[in-house]
Amino acid sequence: MIRSTVRGVGAALPRRVVTNKDLETRLETSDEWIVQRTGIRQRHIASDDETTASLGEAAALRALDAAGLAPADIDLIVVATSTPNNTFPATAVEIQERLGIRQGFAFDMQAVCSGFVYAVTTADLYIRGGMAKRALVIGAETFSRILDWTDRTTCVLFGDGAGAIVLEAEEGQGDISDRGILAEALRSDGSHKEKLYVDGGPSTTRTVGHLRMQGREVFKHAVGMITDVIEDVFGQAGITAEDIDWFVSHQANKRIIDASAKKLGIAEEKVVITVDLHGNTSAASVPLALNHAVSQGKIQKGDLVLLEAMGGGFTWGAVLLRW
C-alpha cells in the first residue's frame, strides 16, 4: 500500500526575540508568573517585513533542502494558517509563486492550532489517493498581528513562526513496520467556539479583530480531548504508549503537555518541549517542535512519532508516523 513518508523538515522564525522580561516592561506581569503557568520563557515576533508567506517560504525551502528536492518536484502545497497574508488568494498560492512552482495545486487550511495536523492528514489522503506524489505541508502564523497587546492573559502566550515537512509517496507493506503515516484521527466540536476565538472577520465586523480566550475553560477540556483522540490512533495502529519513541505535541502550555503525557503513560524523556523557546505559534507549533527534535538529533530513522494538536473551535487531532 502507499504510505506518505517524511522526506524532510524545515523551520523559520522571525529575527526578533521577545523575552518575558521584555514583557514585564509593558505589562503588569512577570517572568515567574508566565513560566509557572505556561512554561514559556520567550517568543519570536515578526517585524513589518516578515509575513506568514515569507516565513512559510523560508521553512519550505529548508524542508526541500533537507529532502534533497527542488521546488519543481512538488505537486501539492497545503498551508495551515489562521493569519493569512490576505483574505484571498490563499497564502499557499503565494508561497507556490515565491517558490517558482507552476505545476500541481495549492490551498490553505484553517483549523487554528490543530491546522498542521489537519493539513498533514489532508495531504496524506491526496497522496494515498494518487492525486499527488510529493506534498509540501506548511504551518505558518503571525499571531502577533491579531493579539490585544493590552490583554496580559493572552498576549504573553503567543509567538510567530513557520515549519514545513515534505511528504512523498512510498510503497509499504501495510503494517506497523512501514515508514510514513500509519494512523490519523481528527475531531471538532463547534459548541466550544466561544472559548477561543477572534472577535472579527470580513463577513461580520469587517475588521481583523483580536484573539479572545477563556483560558481555564480551554485547559479544562484539553487533556481529555487530546488523550481521547490519541487513544483512537493507538487503536487503529494496534500499539500502546510504550511503543512511542517521541511525542510531539502542540506547544501551547507545558502543563497541558505534561498532563497529557502522564495520562497516556508516555515517559517524560520521550516528550518534545519547545514551548519555552517559541510560545504558542498555533499551526506552526507542531512542525517547529518536530524540526527542533530532528535538528537536535533526537528523532532518528525508524522512530515511531506521535503528533497531536488542539485548537479553537474546538478542533483537535493526532497523527502517528514512522520516521
UniProtKB/Swiss-Prot annotation:
The UniProt keyword set, sorted, is: Acyltransferase, Cytoplasm, Fatty acid biosynthesis, Fatty acid metabolism, Lipid biosynthesis, Lipid metabolism, Multifunctional enzyme, Transferase
The pathway this protein participates in, as annotated, is:
Lipid metabolism; fatty acid biosynthesis
Q: What is its main location?
A: cytoplasm
Record has DNA-binding as a keyword = no
Q: State its location(s).
A: Cytoplasm
Q: List the disulfide bonds.
A: none
Positions of the catalytic residues: 113, 250, 280
- GO CC terms, sorted: cytoplasm
| Major enzyme class | transferase
Report which superkingdom the organism of origin falls in.
Bacteria
Similarity comment text for this entry: Belongs to the thiolase-like superfamily. FabH family.
The written remark on domains in the entry is: The last Arg residue of the ACP-binding site is essential for the weak association between ACP/AcpP and FabH.
Name of protein: Beta-ketoacyl-[acyl-carrier-protein] synthase III
According to its UniProt entry, this protein's organism is Chelativorans sp. (strain BNC1)
